[in-house]
Swiss-Prot record:
InterPro entries assigned: aa-tRNA-synth_I_CS (IPR001412), Anticodon_Met (IPR041872), Met-tRNA-synth_bsu_C (IPR004495), Met-tRNA_ligase_1 (IPR023458), Met-tRNA_synth (IPR014758), Methionyl/Leucyl_tRNA_Synth (IPR015413), MetRS_core (IPR033911), MetRS_Zn (IPR029038)
Cofactor dependency: Zn(2+)
Location of region: Disordered: 545-572
Protein name per its UniProtKB record: Methionine--tRNA ligase
Organism: Pseudomonas fluorescens (strain Pf0-1)
UniProt keyword annotation of Plastid present: no
Sequence positions that bind ATP: 334
Entry's family note: Belongs to the class-I aminoacyl-tRNA synthetase family. MetG type 1 subfamily.
Co-factor remark: Binds 1 zinc ion per subunit.
């Protein structure tokens, strides 16, 4: 027998600024099922997580509520922990990034990077709130859109016309925190030299650590050239001060992934047999997996492995990326009652219903998962109650009444029993590959065969016939053993159902290897109902309660739900627009013929764009991210082609190129896939 594997697993850290919703829960359930499967197989698998507890958003919310940030994150952690526990997410440790272990590790990693020459310093110019005495992120600046004139727009984009721009382009800018007029101010910032790790990342991201689709997306960023990453923020800021730099703090995304290490370190400090270096040391032979949503891929597949490499730690074995959650085919919506908090769900329905439905829909790819509430009711009722539990409920009574609850030593269906045994390796492979949907399909196919066999034997009819009692007991004993096999296959997904079944079967906790044996001459306990059907009325009550939960305190944004802790959690989506509004925007593929500096402009580059039959001149505020504009020459990008030309100090701008990121060094020009041609419409 092979040695048990040593595995450390993490999920993305939930942000300690709000409640867990079903989009978040997708990731934690997915991870928990995989961890439970590994433990079920006898492997050492440790699952750690933590609240992501730093940043301006937490500091400002605490101030608004009249409490300290420490009290706020303690309150949120208690809420998160309760939600996870009731959803049966079984962390070995759930910690906080605001902890001494994280402070020590963050400082250690930073100092190693600094001493190795991977940290740069330079001055940047930002808006500053003179009343709050703090620098303002883009989302904390509001003003009049420079494109369409709409008032009360954020510092980087307009919700009315969709334009993106630099905060300095806003007309009549105001601090969203104090209402004061911000002033421009210089500040010394610290940058992680991500380009130092370009070659390593190109090899590592193609080494099987990522799904192919994710590796392809990362390759686009690598091909475009990596930029240095701003890792500092100025006081006041809730986080860790950078060693030796008073008033300078680590940006939340620097210490957040280090929180994985800190949570494990905290567990090691309480568990003498665990060795931190055996899992995180440069030469560690343990496996390390991160489960994340697709919205935070760049942090985990670029910044994080580079930080680990530069600081002398091991890199992840794999990063498992999943998509977003939709409900009834649409973005989660507060007005429709489909933006459902974990607590609201738990107030109405069993967590195992959702665990099974997620498992039945989760493949190994990064596609979005749809929670169709009608299908949810039908599938859970049909598969779990109508198929799996039905086997035991049909047959247990005959054994209790006819043989005092004793299973006879007879296998009445050797071929079917062998088919169940033969299916186990394929189901195990599906679990291992995180293809839970295939594992559930193959398990339910076995349940169908078992039910068909029981229906054919019809013990309820045999029981009425003279002299057929031995056959009744043989059929029912075989059925109970088949039920036991199904429970073994489903245990990582349905731990409560498995525990209740183990109590009925009168057995110790089942392991995966138990599928190779059968119960014979074995005493059962009294059968009690294992699961009830979902009542659609309860689902409706849940959606009604979700409307009451959220519309009282938040306007309806029709927000999509990231199934993790990413950019959307910190910079929510804009309100929905109708199709006609979207259709009015003419998006085109553009070839950058030439990119050049603009004399006298601090933030602008002049781009000459080819859109097929004509060329356009566009000024774009991306200079801070692309200090060498010649590297953009010959690159395809995307532009809004029907913006009214705008007269600027340096000339006429005839459109707008599209980019992502919070600003400063972190601006990422968008590019179409290979094969796109200049002038093609983007649909």
């Amino acid at each position: 027998m092979s040695e048990p594997r040593k595995i450390l697993v993490t999920s993305a850290l939930p942000y300690a600024n709000g409640s867990i919703h079903l989009g978040h829960m997708l990731e934690y359930i997915q991870t928990d099922m995989w961890v439970r499967f590994q433990k079920h197989r006898g492997n050492q698998c440790i699952y750690v997580c933590a609240d992501d507890a730093h940043g301006s958003a937490i500091m400002l919310r605490a101030e608004k509520e009249g409490i300290t940030p420490e009290q706020l994150i303690a309150n949120v952690q208690a809420e998160h922990s309760a939600d996870f526990a009731e959803f049966l997410v079984d962390f070995d440790n759930f910690h906080s990034t605001h902890a001494e272990e994280n402070r020590e590790l963050s400082s250690q990693i930073y100092l190693k990077l600094r001493d190795a020459g991977h940290i740069a310093q330079r001055s940047i110019t930002q808006y500053f709130d003179p009343e709050k005495k703090m620098f303002l992120a883009d989302r904390f600046i509001k003003g009049t859109c420079p494109k369409c004139g709409t008032e009360d727009q954020y510092g980087d984009n307009c919700e009315k016309c969709g334009a993106t721009y630099a905060p300095t382009d806003l007309k009549d800018p105001k601090s969203a925190i104090s209402g004061a007029t911000p002033v421009l101010k210089d500040s010394q910032h610290f940058f992680f030299k991500l380009p130092d790790f370009q070659e390593m990342l190109q090899a590592w991201t193609r080494s099987g650590t990522l799904q192919d689709a994710v590796a392809n997306k990362i390759a686009e960023w690598l091909d475009a050239g990596l930029q240095q990453w701003d890792i500092s923020r100025d006081a006041p800021y809730f986080g860790f001060e950078i060693p030796g730099e008073p008033g300078k703090y680590f940006y939340v995304w620097l210490d957040a992934p280090i929180g994985y290490m800190a949570s494990f370190k905290n567990l090691c400090n309480r568990t003498p047999e665990l060795d931190f270096d055996a899992f995180w040391g440069k030469d560690s032979t343990a496996e390390l997996y991160h489960f994340i949503g697709k919205d935070i891929v760049n942090f985990h597949a670029l910044f994080w492995p580079a930080m680990l490499e530069g600081a002398g730690f091991r890199k992840p074995t794999g990063i498992n990326v999943h998509g977003y959650l939709t409900v009834n085919g649409q973005k989660m919506s507060k007005s429709r009652g489909t933006f459902i908090k974990a607590r609201t769900y738990l107030d109405h329905l069993s967590p195992e219903y959702l665990r099974y439905y997620y498992a039945a829909k989760l493949g190994r790819g990064v596609d979005d998962l749809d929670l169709n509430l009608e299908d949810f009711v039908q599938k859970v009722n049909s598969d779990l109650v109508g198929k799996v539990v039905n086997i035991a409920s049909r047959c247990a009574g005959f054994i209790q009444k006819g043989n005092a609850g004793l299973l006879v030593d007879t296998n009445a269906a050797p071929e079917l029993t062998e088919a169940f045994l033969a299916a186990a390796p394929s189901i195990a492979d599906a679990y291992e590959a995180r293809d839970f949907a295939r594992a559930m399909r193959e398990t339910m196919a076995l349940a169908d065969r078992a039910n068909a066999w029981i229906a054919d034997k019809a013990p309820w009819s045999l029981n009425k016939q003279e002299g057929k009692q031995d056959e009744v007991q043989a059929v029912c004993a075989t059925a109970i053993n088949l039920f036991r096999q199904l429970v073994i296959f489903l245990k990582p997904v349905l731990p409560v159902l498995a525990a209740d079944a183990e109590a009925f079967l009168n057995v110790a906790p089942l392991t995966w290897n138990d599928h190779t044996t059968l119960l014979a001459n074995h005493q059962l306990n009294e059968f009690k109902p294992l699961m009830t059907r979902i009542d659609p009325v309860k689902v409706q009550a849940m959606t009604d309660a979700s409307k009451e939960d959220l519309t009282a305190s938040q306007t309806d944004t029709g927000a999509a739900a990231p199934a993790g802790n990413g950019e959307l959690a910190k910079d929510p989506l804009s309100p929905e627009i109708d199709f006609d509004t979207f259709a009015a925007v003419d998006l085109r593929v553009a070839l950058i013929v030439k990119a050049e500096h603009v004399e006298g402009a601090d933030k602008l580059l002049r781009l000459t764009l080819d859109i097929g039959d004509e060329q356009r001149n566009v000024f774009s505020g991306i200079k801070s991210a692309y200090p060498d504009p010649s590297k953009l020459d010959g690159r395809l990008t995307m532009m809004i082609a029907n913006l009214k030309p705008r007269k600027m100090k340096f000339g006429i701008s005839e459109g707008m190129v599209m980019a992502a990121g919070p600003g400063g060094e972190e601006i990422y020009l968008l590019s179409p896939d290979s094969g796109a041609k200049p002038g093609q419409r983007i649909k």
